[in-house]
């Protein structure tokens, strides 16, 4: 049994996750000693939880397009780890989108998993929850400012806006993103996946 399987069992045994474990819903994350990139998003969506595939929706299609890689490579490579801020679908919010990831979840499990991935080059931080946790006081005053200043976080972290169709307006207002941030993302991906 690998260390990642042991951690998975610990997560399932944690009382914080008992409702999921009782309903036979395992945590959704992917970790590997060969991982060079870690993608940290908010939490699995309903479809991801049902299909057991991260980013298995329109947001994932856009993310893979931004990265410049195929769906097959995205799911098959051990060089990409997936550590959402919560490993379980938190439910639908009253407004658009999903309920935020549970407080304390990433703090408890991410350090244990990251410690076991010695080859990590860059942690890709998708959305404000991931950015606030990993960048903490180094974050800008809002997501736009944090992402605009992406170069100051490299090479350890790369903040991205969420690739959701709900963010099309943001992308139109911030055209610098696809001209500056996406090329930087592709350089990182090429260096770590395709060499």
Predicted regions and their residues:
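A polyanion-binding, active-site-adjacent surface
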Residues: 1-193
């Amino acid at each position: 049994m690998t260390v990642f399987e042991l951690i998975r069992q610990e997560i399932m045994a944690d009382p914080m996750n008992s409702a999921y474990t009782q309903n036979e819903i395992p945590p959704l994350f992917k970790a590997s000693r060969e991982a060079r990139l870690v993608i940290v998003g908010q939490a699995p969506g309903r479809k991801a939880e049902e299909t057991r595939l991260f980013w298995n929706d329109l947001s994932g299609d856009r993310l893979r397009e931004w990265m410049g890689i195929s769906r097959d490579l995205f799911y098959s490579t051990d060089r990409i780890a997936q550590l959402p801020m919560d490993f379980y679908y938190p439910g639908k919010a009253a407004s658009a989108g999903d309920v935020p990831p549970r407080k304390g979840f990433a703090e408890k499990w991410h350090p244990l998993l990251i410690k076991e991935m010695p080859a990590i080059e860059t942690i890709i931080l998708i959305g404000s929850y991931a950015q606030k946790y990993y960048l903490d006081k180094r974050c800008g005053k809002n997501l736009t400012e944090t992402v605009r200043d992406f170069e100051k976080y490299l090479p350890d972290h790369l903040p991205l806006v969420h690739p959701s169709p709900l963010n099309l307006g943001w992308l139109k207002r911030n055209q610098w993103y696809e001209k500056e941030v996406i090329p930087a993302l592709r350089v990182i991906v090429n260096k770590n996946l395709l060499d």
